[in-house]
Amino acid sequence: MENIQKLIARYPLVEDLVALKETTWFNPGATSLAQGLPYVGLTEQDVNAAHDRLARFAPYLAKAFPQTAAAGGMIESDVVAIPAMQKRLEKEYGQTINGEMLLKKDSHLAISGSIKARGGIYEVLTHAEKLALEAGLLTTDDDYSVLLSPEFKQFFSQYSIAVGSTGNLGLSIGIMSACIGFKVTVHMSADARAWKKAKLRSHGVTVVEYEDDYGVAVEQGRKAAQSDPNCFFIDDENSRTLFLGYAVAGQRLKAQFAQQGRVVDASHPLFVYLPCGVGGGPGGVAFGLKLAFGDNVHCFFAEPTHSPCMLLGVYTGLHDAISVQDIGIDNLTAADGLAVGRASGFVGRAMERLLDGLYTLDDQTMYDMLGWLAQEEGIRLEPSALAGMAGPQRICASVAYQQRHGFSQTQLGNATHLVWATGGGMVPEDEMEQYLAKGR
């Protein structure tokens, strides 16, 4: 307890985190892209290479997953305006939201119905390509739909994949790995929803369940993989490959905005609100957005009050050297995808200069907004996916933040607020009804 008091003396906001208060922290260390980029350790070339790799796999994906065929084997989600929800939020919170609110529906991505369809699937494909190229079975000029042949399935069946997950990452990696022919084991934390485990098992995936939280599931997955040279462990806490799979979203969004005639520049700022668990998904997406829109995009991470691992790590500068449990927080939240007690040290250090801020919200707030979105827009998400929905009113309410960045009322009036909906498209009907019943 004495250590917590010392921490609070240096970092006063920790007191609010410990008290489980909804907290907003605007990052005083936020810099320009030019200043912040070198610290990421990855470049635009790396993201372009990821983009190209996904293009090589497009013919394969189009055949393996017919739901991607219309998009030519591209796994991408819609961006939709949510004007009725914007009005509802203004009414509920008594706060005008300047500009226009949009929803990025990663909740409805093909294959696994969450943002993890970006990073998880990309890393599995990257590993499969590497093995096939090294074995001389494939060249990068080939039509990758040959990977669907029995010979390739046979080849990949010698190899296995392991991952630790609270649910959605396991879903994307499990489904993709099983499709390619890998043996796959998903180490699931106590937070993982039963339907996600059942879905994985229906794809022939081995699911190992733990009574502990996410950190333990990842650690056990890592250990299990170490003993088997043919087993590849996908490391959600440190993976650069996952990060790049998410980062591709930046250029894709830029293209979607161009199609819609939506301008993002100094006079028309873009604010993006990303739910954050361990940090790989939001970190990678934010990195891609920064490369695509430069200093005209402002990224915020959103976390449950019971799992504020990234806010705690970045705010104190301790990153993965501190967990929410260290300050007496239980890491128990209805936002199962965000139930992470210790943030990725890689993501925190890579992105701490490129984030405008982080905030927390209560589980009940997520349930309330889940209900409002279903009522107003007919869009149903899982609780985690609503974390970003609390962002616009926090930004619009903070005169200090607006002044620090020199935003005029005109600029704010021209702003786009993009809420990144991270999951929920595959939630079973009865489960969704339970979520809806919890909203006020």
Swiss-Prot record:
Cofactor(s) needed by this chain: pyridoxal 5'-phosphate
Annotated signal sequence range: none
GO MF term set: D-serine ammonia-lyase activity; hydro-lyase activity; pyridoxal phosphate binding
This enzyme's EC code(s): 4.3.1.18
Key words of the record: Lyase, Pyridoxal phosphate
Modified residues (N6-(pyridoxal phosphate)lysine): K116
Broadest EC class assigned to this enzyme: lyase
PANTHER family listed in its UniProt record: D-SERINE DEHYDRATASE, THREONINE DEHYDRATASE, MITOCHONDRIAL-RELATED
Subunit-level organization: Monomer.
Protein name: D-serine dehydratase
Lineage per the UniProt record: Bacteria, Pseudomonadati, Pseudomonadota, Gammaproteobacteria, Enterobacterales
